[in-house]
Amino acid sequence: MRLRPMTSMMFWLPVATSLLAPAAMADDTSSPFDLFAERCLDQGPRYDRTVAFAKEREWAALAEDITLGIVPLNEPTAFDGWIVQTGGDKPFEALVVAKASVGKKAVESCSMAFAGIGAEQFELFLTTTRHAIPSGQQSGAVRSRKFFTIVRDGSKEAVTLDLPLYPNGADEVVASIVAEQQIEN
């Protein structure tokens, strides 16, 4: 599975976190990892369900160029992104979903971008609570992209964390999961 280069995400996340006006507040006090697990990991990416959920919540749309900078797939056939939280006492959060074809398989992705959170703690939660198995790493000048595999019901799902090389506890983290599209009845 081919993922997008790190450079676009490295550029757009700081822009998004510094320029966006306050948006609809998230209505829970869950940790960033719990939010990623609830919205992306627990049931896998669900593009249509997530789009409907975001519309119901009336989340503000994320700019298309920023959304594309967060999408982990090359050449998505559909994508949407929203500002879930910014301002107030909670850190910035964005949610992005996409669909694409990889070979002959239809896949979906779900990503969340956070600012002002602990990157090391986020990674620890992923490996300990979801038994994510490390499968590779790519490092740039200031950021690292770590790849993991989660096996669920006999299917492998790819998880990617985009983290700072030198975390300080108030970090920008982008977490993504890519899985084969599940057809809901």
Protein language model regions, located:
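Long, charged/polar, surface-exposed segments that mediate recognition or autoinhibition
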Residues: 83-147
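N-terminal signal peptide c-region/cleavage motif recognized by signal peptidases
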Residues: 21-23
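N-terminal leader/targeting segments
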Residues: 27-94, 98-99
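Compact alpha-helical subdomains of small soluble proteins
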Residues: 74-81, 101-102, 106-108, 113, ...
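Glycine-rich, aromatic-bearing surface loops/beta-hairpins
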Residues: 137-185
